[in-house]
A protein has these predicted regions:
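Nucleotide-activated donor-binding/catalytic signature segment of Leloir-type glycosyltransferases, i.e.
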Residues: 236-261
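A short, well-ordered alpha-helix in the C-terminal region of glycosyltransferases
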Residues: 321, 335-349, 358-361
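Carbohydrate-associated surface elements
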Residues: 41, 150, 169
Length: 383
């Protein structure tokens, strides 16, 4: 099967959608299919051989974050040429209503289209306003996937119709095999608390965690906060309370191998996000690596954590509740071991062996619905 995967977001900056598309492409290639990815990317950005650049992206505020998107006539020509040259059996477009490469690919598509919706935003005025203009294009989508119930509700609320829920996939074996590093491991007197996310994006929750750490340090003076992610380290350091700054190490972005080792090392991984999350791929990565997880009680996070059975939760944007639970977990080695074990088991349900099979089932359903009347004979024979 020849599959064209389309990312709306730039591969210059790491993100959950980009990781999902990259890993899906590699999973499909590993199964013997031919997969190619089209995504925005600056010139000179190192890209896997199967990723093709649609040109430089522009940062735009979107869903409480800054997304790097790509749009315009020149990009539209590149998209059309990539689709024609790829001779794909099927296009799998991610976030097809975002004004970027995905929407352009939807307009240019002539083959069957599967779309994955990642965004969770039930009050999107932009989506409501754009729906009448997008409706003819949306009718070209033969199969809809939402990465969570929250994303599915966003689709049904603003775009009509429905979508099958298939979560983001994670190579859980990669994280499970990670070896802890001594410099990131804690001791009873100096436990380590891990944060992973863009440090200058408020919805990732670092300010909430920093406030909570003030109380944590009063109870456990030797506690260390290890922060991983892109953003201005000097600016982030300056925003931290003085006592918290002294206990914080800003590690910057890490390679995939080091990220897995980081998650395998910390005593507790904290996800203090404040909103705008439809899934929570980093929670799955942390669980797969064996980190006990403490996350804000966003609906998407609670579902990933199996209703709280695979990780602990605290009241979103409540640093006092976060501090109380974090201190309790850091002081209880038995509970940490239980959270780690339950998290590892839960993470396996998001492995690519499971998720990939569900996505392929959607592909087959869409292609079978088009054959034999609309699919060229060569493609039916080679599938």
């Amino acid at each position: 099967m020849r599959v064209g995967l389309v990312s709306p977001y730039s591969f210059d900056v790491p993100g959950g959608v980009q990781f999902h598309i990259r890993d899906l492409a590699e999973h499909l290639i590993g199964l013997g299919h031919q997969a190619a990815v089209l995504a925005p990317a600056d010139e000179g950005t190192p890209l896997p051989h199967y990723v093709h650049s649609a040109g430089r992206a522009v940062p735009i505020r979107y869903n409480g974050s800054v997304a790097r998107l790509n749009f315009g006539p020149l990009v539209a020509n590149r998209v059309s040429r990539w689709i024609a040259d790829g001779d794909f059996d099927l296009l799998h477009i991610h976030e097809p209503v975002t004004p970027s490469v995905g929407l352009l690919a939807l307009w240019a598509s002539t083959q069957p289209v599967v779309a994955t919706f990642h965004t969770s935003n039930l009050r999107s005025r932009a989506m409501q306003a754009a729906y009448p203009l997008l409706r003819p294009s949306l009718e070209k989508i033969s199969g809809r996937i939402a990465v969570s119930e929250d994303a599915r509700r966003t689709v049904t609320t603003h775009l009509g119709g429905d979508a099958v829920v298939i979560p983001n996939g994670v190579d859980t074996g990669f994280f499970a095999r990670a070896t802890a590093k001594g410099e990131w491991q804690g001791t009873p007197e100096r436990p380590t608390v891990g944060f992973l996310g863009r440090i200058d994006e408020r919805r990732k929750g670092l300010p909430v965690l920093a406030d909570a750490m003030r109380s944590v340090l009063r109870e456990i003076p030797g506690a260390r906060l290890l922060v991983v992610g892109p953003g201005s380290a000097p600016a982030a350091q300056a925003r931290l309370p003085e006592d918290v700054a002294a206990a914080t190490e800003l590690l910057g972005p890490l390679s995939d191998d080091d990220k897995a080792a980081f998650l395998a090392s910390v005593d507790v991984y904290v996800a203090p996000h404040t909103g705008g999350e439809s899934f929570g791929i980093v929670l799955v990565e942390a669980m797969a690596a064996g980190a006990p997880v403490l996350a804000s009680d966003l609906p998407a996070f609670v579902r990933v954590l199996d209703g709280g059975g695979a990780g602990a939760t605290f009241s979103t944007e409540h640093p006092d509740d976060l501090a109380e639970q974090l201190v309790a977990i850091l002081r209880d080695g038995t509970r940490r071991a239980e959270l780690s074990a339950r998290g590892r088991r839960r993470a396996t349900t998001f492995d690519w062996e499971v998720v990939g099979a569900e996505i392929l089932a959607v592909y087959e359903t869409v292609l079978d619905a088009r054959a034999p009347r609309e699919m060229p004979a060569r493609r039916r024979e080679n599938r």
